[in-house]
Amino acid sequence: MFPFEDENLPLFTVGQVADMLRVQQAFLRRLDEFGVVRPSRSPGGQRRYSRTEVTIVRYVAELADGGMTLAAIRRVLELEEQVKALEAERDELLAALAERDERLAALARRVRFDQGS
């Protein structure tokens, strides 16, 4: 993978993100201060946003434009992360359950075969 293909590579400055999304730089700083979007920092301490974070900021800006407070937006993002984690856990459990069902079916076939002998 080339570095520019990495969605999580911190590439963009506050000014670049503000220009891309047509938001104020102060808005981006507030998102960081309130823990809504926490970009990486350069060695010099400047905020650097990945493409993933830019996408999140775009979403956050839409929610803020709709009248949501930063505290409410942070909670929405937290809940969405919890949903993703729970969905991943559910998928793992379903896979384990399917594997167990396959083992049980194989054992049942073996028992039927052994009883038929």
Locate the predicted segments by residue.
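Beta-hairpin "wing" of winged helix-turn-helix
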Residues: 38-44
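Minor-groove-contacting beta-hairpin "wing" of winged helix-turn-helix DNA-binding domains
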Residues: 45-51
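Arg/Lys-rich, alpha-helical DNA-contact motif
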Residues: 1-10, 19, 33, 51-117
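Alpha-helical DNA-recognition elements
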Residues: 30, 34-36
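Short coil turns linking two alpha-helices in DNA-binding domains
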Residues: 24-27
